[in-house]
Amino acid sequence: LSVTYDGWIDLFCWGTGNCPTKVSTDIFSPDTAFVNFVDWGINQIGNDKPNTWRTLTNEEWNYLTDGKEGRKNADSLCSVAQVDGINGFILLPDNWTCPSNVSFKRGVAVGHSEKNYAEHQIITLENWLVLEESGAIFLPVTEDNMYSYGNENSEGYYWSSTLKGKYSPHVYAYYFEFDASYAGCMFNSTSKRLFVRLVKDVK
């Protein structure tokens, strides 16, 4: 993604891997609400075979970002930034070491608005490519239908593969959310349209 990108960025209702255009009415009924998760990785992605990629579980998202439930140094293995003009959240591998030829500020910003990403740090595309090579992952802020106010440049929402439960008249699933000063897992209706970020298991 970059400020000049003008292609499609898709949002999905939960678990619609085999039917990405389907929209749940979110009524407690097996016919209309999403209960059985179908991973988006069921599709062929690039030259990889179907089911090579998958969606992170709620437990995995928590491991990455929650120092109480996951890795103890989670707070120092994440950051926020404006990367090549795009606001977003950065995840770092366990035992990560910053490359010597770039500067990097760990942790999140003090404020939670759009401007706080750039105030925390600005990373050029050249430097980001170095960080990416070292294992850093960038999650751009997202558009969504979660709330009515505009947050397309300040917050991010990414589905997990974990169902929360059926509480009539709603069906809920977990998702990962962030702004410039916060990151964590929440749950909401499976009818919400959010981003997905797939991963590949290391063998």
Regions of interest found by a model, annotated:
Residues L1-F37, N51-T65:
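A short glycine-rich, aromatic-capped structural motif
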Residues V3, T16, I42, D48-K203:
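C-terminal, surface-exposed recognition/capping segments
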